[in-house]
UniProtKB/Swiss-Prot annotation:
The keyword Plastid does not apply. It is a peripheral membrane protein. Belongs to the UPF0161 family. One of its GO terms (cellular component) is plasma membrane. This is Putative membrane protein insertion efficiency factor. Its main location: membrane.
Length: 81
């Protein structure tokens, strides 16, 4: 299911995005961010992170470096210690 959610993002990145000028104010670009967020966090959480990022990508935002937050680590390692 996760791979199916990534197909439209890949299509945009490789078929549509090269035809348009670079408009994203962030690094990584919004499409790269969305792909990485869904890949690392799953469809629901990653999709929510991508929607929030797209909401911040507008002319009144300065942009800059905005990486995908790391996936939460498992709690079992801290419990075992």
């Amino acid at each position: 299911m996760r791979k199916l959610a990534l197909v439209p993002i890949q299509f945009y990145r490789y078929a549509i995005s090269p035809l348009m000028a670079n408009h994203c104010r962030f690094f990584p670009s919004c499409s790269c961010y969305a792909y990485e967020a869904i890949e690392n966090h799953g469809i629901w959480r990653g999709g929510w992170l991508a929607v929030r990022r797209l909401g911040r990508c507008h002319p009144w935002n300065d942009g800059g470096f905005d990486p995908v937050p790391p996936a939460p680590s498992s709690r079992t390692s801290s419990i075992a210690e």
